[in-house]
Swiss-Prot record:
Residues 1-7, 72-82, 153-184, 261-266 are extracellular. GO terms for cellular component: membrane; plasma membrane. InterPro entries: GPCR_Rhodpsn_7TM (IPR017452), TAS2R (IPR007960). It is found in: Membrane. It comes from Homo sapiens. One of its GO terms (molecular function) is bitter taste receptor activity. PROSITE patterns: G_PROTEIN_RECEP_F1_2 (PS50262). The chain crosses the membrane at residues 8-28, 51-71, 83-103, 132-152, 185-205, 240-260, 267-287. This is Taste receptor type 2 member 8. The gene is TAS2R8. It is a multi-pass membrane protein. Residues 29-50, 104-131, 206-239, 288-309 are cytoplasmic. Keywords: G-protein coupled receptor, Glycoprotein, Membrane, Receptor, Sensory transduction, Taste, Transducer, Transmembrane, Transmembrane helix. Glycans are attached at residue 167. The lineage of its organism: Eukaryota, Metazoa, Chordata, Craniata, Vertebrata. Receptor that may play a role in the perception of bitterness and is gustducin-linked. May play a role in sensing the chemical composition of the gastrointestinal content. The activity of this receptor may stimulate alpha gustducin, mediate PLC-beta-2 activation and lead to the gating of TRPM5.
Length: 309
């Protein structure tokens, strides 16, 4: 029998799952149709398509994890189940982080202006090597998830042996969360791509500041397209920073939840807040991307006309 909190959690997480799949699926579908029509795809659309596919995987893993927690709160005490869930989550999490970082770096290279040789070389090369970069993101994520599975498996074995030792009963009692240390460690590693995104964000803001100063010197009274592109990219990256911060805090909350008396409630709250990252940022991308937004508006218009007929 589910508690009222469990019922609310299931309703909320189901709603987030539906919105997440629809939002990310919409981005993938629009880019795929555009790819078929034009027989080619732009670099930004290619990165976005890979990103939303990775986010669909992440949302699915998180929702499955949330439902399993409700149905079987003791799942984290079972080695095999926890290793499988944690491995898939690590892979999807890192893949999302690295592809999002690629998107943020791409925005910076394509929109910002600089005469530095390294910047110009990267700006020239990014379109040519994007396939290899995304393949590298996949390889890194797969490697990290396999390492996570091995570390977690060894950690479980150690605690299983320690549990039967009389002299270290206290140590096992303190370490009642066998996956606590691996989770903390891999959460910390996720900061690396975030730092790269943060650097790209500040460099883009600096580029906008320099560009604005130049515009003021040669003001024409008309709207500057470059400034609008800068602002749109900064809004996208700002939303990513906000949602990732929320996601990271939620992940830490879930990691430490078993130290709390209401651990199940803490995990449920953390899951709901964490899913806002792959859901919310993708919705922001739709709003700020001209092609995605205009396609969505046309769909709504056609639907209204069809209803009137």
């Amino acid at each position: 029998m589910f508690s009222p909190a469990d019922n609310i959690f299931i309703i909320l997480i189901t709603g987030e799952f539906i919105l997440g799949i629809l939002g990310n699926g919409y981005i993938a579908l629009v880019n795929w149709i555009d790819w078929i029509k034009k027989k080619k795809i732009s670099t930004v659309d290619y990165i976005l398509t890979n990103l939303v596919i990775a986010r669909i995987c992440l949302i699915s893993v998180m929702v499955v994890n949330g439902i399993v927690i409700v149905l079987n709160p003791d799942v984290y005490t079972k080695n095999k189940q926890q290793i499988v869930i944690f491995t898939f989550w690590t892979f999807a999490n890192y893949l999302n982080m690295w592809i999002t970082t690629c998107l943020n770096v791409f925005y910076f290279l394509k929109i910002a202006s600089s005469s530095h040789p390294l910047f110009l070389w990267l700006k020239w090369k990014i379109d040519m090597v994007v396939h290899w970069i995304l393949l590298g993101c996949f390889a890194i994520s797969l490697l990290v998830s396999l390492i996570a599975a091995i570390v977690l498996s060894c950690d479980y074995r150690f605690h299983a042996i320690a549990k039967h030792k009389r002299n270290i009963t206290e140590m096992f009692h303190v370490s009642k969360i066998p996956y606590f240390e691996p989770l903390t460690l891999f959460n910390l590693f996720a900061i690396v791509p975030f730092i790269v995104s943060l650097i790209s964000f500040f460099l883009l803001v600096r580029s906008l500041w320099r560009h604005t100063k130049q515009i003021k010197l040669y003001a024409t009274g008309s709207r500057d397209p470059s400034t609008e592109v800068h602002v749109r990219a900064i809004k996208t990256m700002t939303s990513f920073i906000f949602f990732f911060f929320l996601y990271y805090i939620s992940s830490i909350l879930m990691t430490f939840s078993y130290l709390m008396t209401k651990y199940k409630l803490a995990v449920e709250f953390g899951e709901i807040a964490a899913i806002l990252y792959p859901l919310g940022h993708s919705l922001i991308l739709i709003v700020l991307n001209n092609k995605l937004r205009q396609t969505f508006v046309r769909m709504l218009t056609c639907r209204k006309i069809a209803c009137m007929i």
